[in-house]
Amino acid sequence: MKINIGGGFKRYDGFLNLDADPLTNPDFLVKLGEDKLPFDDNSVDEVKAYHILEHIGHGFFQLMQEIYRVCKDTAIIDIQVPHHRSEVFYGDPSHIRFITVDNMRLFSKKYNKWHIGQWNSSSGFGLPLNVDFEIIEYEFIVDDHWKSRFANMSDEERNEVARNFNNVYGETHMKLMVMKDA
């Protein structure tokens, strides 16, 4: 089974839509971060979370636990969010949570254990929430304003620009893999 969480009016072939807004006519009316996802444990192969996670406030950790619960081992979570240093993020008052590669890494038990060993710090969410997501790929989408400027820059130069200026990247795309013990 494949699900599209918080998809609004956007539909994808083969995906069930979950949304809190009845006007979007979702397959399942669900308040993400508050309601349990209406699926059995280990029943979902893929989750699309396009421009929704940044809208989830206090229920964010509950939502991550619910996604983990319903997903099968090796399920893919496909995430797209506004980049945390873009006006796209800041321009919408309903964007209340930064979603970054660094903060999503905190949902990895492997990373949590490494962090404990390296720094004697239990910083992370994978172990205390009993979830395990590994980032398998990510990409920062260059804002249109910067595309032509980046054409002749080296990777090092691009990274330097992105460290020093806002609005270089418009979106962050990443894929997580659900890791469950056999």
Tell what function each PLM region has:
Residues 2-83:
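Conserved SAM-binding loop
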Residues 57-62, 66, 72, 76-182:
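S-adenosyl-L-methionine-dependent methyltransferase catalytic module, highlighting the catalytic core
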